[in-house]
């Protein structure tokens, strides 16, 4: 099963749609960007509902792969992201025209 934008999905919603027959779960997303939207502030704070299952697994240091080469941004943006220590390993693909 492949889950796109996994960092934006509430953990309960994700668990609810995983059928018992699933042998592999591939989650794609960016845990450093958008988080799940929770409208009940008290529940969100008390139970950390704004942290997705994807982010929890990354924070628990389970094995994951991170994008190393990007093909959409200008080099200046990539340099800024590295300076801010958000994506220190990120590089621009040689074929990017900017």
Language-model-detected regions and their locations in the chain:
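Conserved helicase motor core of SF1/SF2 NTP-dependent helicases
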Residues: 1-98
